[in-house]
């Protein structure tokens, strides 16, 4: 699914690219697996902005994804690979042999007609979901649970994966996409393989309008605001903030750790993620 560059017929097209979606085999989603999706504009129930730079965008319907993969022992055939506007990865429509239909994240090299299965007895093949205790060390997995039965929470974005690097007792050590090494209970489930649509990171949006279609609003620098709006604001012309970089609420930013101290999950983290810019 490579990215296609446009000819520079306009300033917006000059620096833009799109995914070809060669692997997408079905355009219309399965109606029984759709749900309403209400936009919040980044506001909470009181109407206050809790997440900045969100709002607008094309209307969407949510695709109900099976992150638990708890239908054990029943084979399922991949009926289609579909586009999902709510995530960077594509999704696969499964037709179980008992008649049920479900969506899962589409791993790389999973094609229409492939047969997948979930459960402790499943083989270690691409698209199969099974407990980490039954997956060999060194295997690449995605859609990993943090707690048994809670559903996949790790390595769900396009092109991401985690690797099993050790097993000790009831705990399995994973190397996550960020570089963090973390222990997870062996009963937690994971799906074998790498999340597909890895070319998503190569897309160049080209113009602001394409980001607005995604529901992403502009990010304004604090130094061009008024003093009432940001600690960096005000001054005559282009002026320096005169202080260390801070958030709009005055908290130190650009490198200061924001993780809470003494979290319960600290005991499960072997090594924190690599510092610096991540892609």
From Swiss-Prot:
One of its GO terms (biological process) is cytoplasmic translation. Pfam families: Ribosomal_L2, Ribosomal_L2_C. Residues 12-22 have a biased composition (Polar residues). Residues 1-28, 221-279 are annotated as: Disordered. GO terms for molecular function: rRNA binding; structural constituent of ribosome; transferase activity. PROSITE patterns: RIBOSOMAL_L2 (PS00467). GO terms for cellular component: large ribosomal subunit. Keywords: Ribonucleoprotein, Ribosomal protein, RNA-binding, rRNA-binding. It comes from the Bacteria. InterPro entries: NA-bd_OB-fold, Rib_uL2_dom2, Ribosomal_uL2, Ribosomal_uL2_bac/org-type, Ribosomal_uL2_C, Ribosomal_uL2_CS, Ribosomal_uL2_dom3, Ribosomal_uL2_RNA-bd_dom. Transmembrane segments: none annotated. Gene3D superfamilies: 2.30.30.30, Nucleic acid-binding proteins, Ribosomal protein L2, domain 3. Belongs to the universal ribosomal protein uL2 family. One of the primary rRNA binding proteins. Required for association of the 30S and 50S subunits to form the 70S ribosome, for tRNA binding and peptide bond formation. It has been suggested to have peptidyltransferase activity; this is somewhat controversial. Makes several contacts with the 16S rRNA in the 70S ribosome. NCBIfam families: rplB_bact. Part of the 50S ribosomal subunit. Forms a bridge to the 30S subunit in the 70S ribosome. This is Large ribosomal subunit protein uL2. The gene is rplB.
């Amino acid at each position: 699914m490579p990215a296609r560059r446009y000819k520079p017929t306009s300033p917006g097209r000059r620096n833009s690219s799109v995914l070809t979606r060669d692997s997408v085999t079905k355009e219309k989603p399965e109606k029984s697996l759709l749900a309403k999706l209400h936009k919040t504009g980044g506001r909470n129930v009181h109407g206050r902005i809790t997440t900045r730079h969100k709002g607008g965008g094309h209307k969407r319907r949510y695709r109900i994804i099976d992150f638990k993969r708890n239908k054990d022992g029943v084979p399922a055939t991949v009926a289609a690979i579909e586009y999902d506007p709510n995530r960077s990865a594509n999704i696969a429509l499964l037709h179980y042999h008992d008649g049920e239909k479900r969506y899962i994240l589409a791993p790389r090299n999973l094609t229409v007609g492939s047969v997948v299965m979930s459960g402790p007895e499943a083989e270690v093949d691409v698209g199969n979901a099974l407990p980490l205790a039954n997956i060999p060390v060194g295997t690449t997995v995605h859609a990993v649970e943090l707690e048994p039965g809670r559903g996949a929470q790790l390595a769900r974005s396009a092109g991401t994966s985690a690797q099993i690097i050790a097993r000790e007792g009831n705990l399995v050590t994973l190397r996550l996409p960020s570089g963090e090494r973390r222990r997870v209970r062996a009963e937690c489930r994971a799906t074998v393989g790498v999340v597909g649509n890895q070319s998503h990171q190569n897309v160049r949006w080209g113009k602001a309008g394409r980001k607005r279609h995604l529901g992403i609003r502009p990010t304004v620098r604090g130094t061009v605001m008024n003093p009432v709006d940001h600690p960096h604001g005000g001054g005559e012309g282009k002026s320096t903030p005169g202080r260390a970089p801070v958030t709009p609420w005055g908290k130190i930013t650009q490198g200061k750790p924001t993780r809470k101290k003494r979290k319960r999950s600290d005991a499960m983290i072997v090594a924190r993620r690599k510092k610096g810019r991540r892609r």
